[in-house]
Amino acid sequence: MSRRAEVTRNTSETQIRVALDLDGTGKQTLNTGVPFLDHMLDQIARHGMVDLDVTATGDTHIDDHHTVEDVGITLGQAVAKAIGDKKGIVRYGHSYVPLDEALSRVVIDFSGRPGLEFHVPFTRARVGSFDVDLSIEFFRGFVNHAGVTLHIDNLRGVNAHHQIETVFKAFGRALRMAVEIDPRAAGTIPSTKGAL
């Protein structure tokens, strides 16, 4: 069973293309026009073992907001498309990831109910030119279009780069766990309702 998807999103602000393979090896080709976002998408691909190809052009002459948010939206749509009816998936995933002084926890549920709890007490407003608030916009876009519940907690950290990077690495690992096929649950929906 192939769990690949390709989604494009074209608006007056951005043009986004995301292609992915949930059963990949972490290969990636990333060109969003926002270098720090490319760095974070690399974390998702490598730690989630998702092959990821993302290209984006956007109104970055204004700021990076629309590009970052729309990449999150398009990635969410692609994951939802690739995962299909969710039969046989583990459904839940979680991960703790440290990076030096920083530690983050991410928990995901492919519930079909979009919800985001994002608790990251950033220690500064920017990492290089990247506005740290855009990380929540990325995950909000993802959650609303993948149909997942996502809890993100940075438990400690002093360096804002480390805070964000641990979040994206933990997200990749939690995603990998949740979308794995459980051989004991082949062909069944992981819910007592029989639907997600």
Curated annotation (Swiss-Prot):
GO terms for cellular component: cytoplasm. Its main location: cytoplasm. It comes from the Bacteria. This is Imidazoleglycerol-phosphate dehydratase. CDD domains: IGPD. It is found in: Cytoplasm. Belongs to the imidazoleglycerol-phosphate dehydratase family. GO terms for molecular function: imidazoleglycerol-phosphate dehydratase activity. GO terms for biological process: L-histidine biosynthetic process. It is an enzyme of class 4 (lyase). InterPro entries: IGPD_sf, ImidazoleglycerolP_deHydtase, ImidazoleglycerP_deHydtase_CS, Ribosomal_Su5_D2-typ_SF. Keywords: Amino-acid biosynthesis, Cytoplasm, Histidine biosynthesis, Lyase. It catalyses: D-erythro-1-(imidazol-4-yl)glycerol 3-phosphate = 3-(imidazol-4-yl)-2-oxopropyl phosphate + H2O. The lineage of its organism: Bacteria, Pseudomonadati, Pseudomonadota, Betaproteobacteria, Burkholderiales. Pathway: Amino-acid biosynthesis; L-histidine biosynthesis; L-histidine from 5-phospho-alpha-D-ribose 1-diphosphate: step 6/9. Its EC number is 4.2.1.19.
